């Protein structure tokens, strides 16, 4: 029986524990959780860069959107290298693949090569987003999941444990949704995950689970935590 293969999306904010830059203790704890479950599950990871730069936010403040997005992509490379280091300290075997060529620190992203790494038990970390501006890392996570034939996309969120009817940090009456279709999520304008990412999943029948960082190991292991999204 083939191993379960998952694509895990980690937000940049999770690397700083909600603060800017990288908190070594936080990343070490994340890495330890991943290594524990990587013995029996093939894990690929897309990392965000929001703890350094957010392209959309920089653009709103007057910077050219494409340049701002490239800055965000470079932030994801920093996070990928930090995660790689702590994964290896915890005993994991890893590879970083970047969508932008930087051969001194990462392989160039090649889907077939990534699949080979996964079958050999390596944790593969995808960096630099899509290598092009105007794509969120949520959307890139779905693209990568489709390309490496992952069974599910797991979206780990910092500060929220699933999809809600409204922003729970603003509206205390917001209700958690445990299961929802992509079409309903799009029609209701639920914004926890990028709409382009939801549309891609809906088009290709790829399941998704959105959950809080505290449930990372359970989500990767296949337990029903957070919110399940499907067709």
Swiss-Prot record:
It is found in: Cytoplasm. It catalyses: UMP + ATP = UDP + ADP. ATP binds at residues 9-12, 50, 54, 158, 164, 167. InterPro entries: AceGlu_kinase-like_sf (IPR036393), Asp/Glu/Uridylate_kinase (IPR001048), Uridylate_kinase (IPR011817), Uridylate_kinase_bac (IPR015963). HAMAP family: PyrH_B. The gene is pyrH. This is Uridylate kinase. Keywords: ATP-binding, Cytoplasm, Kinase, Nucleotide-binding, Pyrimidine biosynthesis, Transferase. Homohexamer. One of its GO terms (molecular function) is UMP kinase activity. Pathway: Pyrimidine metabolism; CTP biosynthesis via de novo pathway; UDP from UMP (UMPK route): step 1/1. Belongs to the UMP kinase family. One of its GO terms (cellular component) is cytoplasm. It holds the Pfam family AA_kinase. Inhibited by UTP. SUPFAM superfamilies: Carbamate kinase-like (SSF53633). It comes from the Bacteria. Its EC number is 2.7.4.22. UMP binds at residues 49, 69, 130-137. Catalyzes the reversible phosphorylation of UMP to UDP. GO terms for biological process: 'de novo' CTP biosynthetic process; UDP biosynthetic process. Its main location: cytoplasm. It is an enzyme of class 2 (transferase).
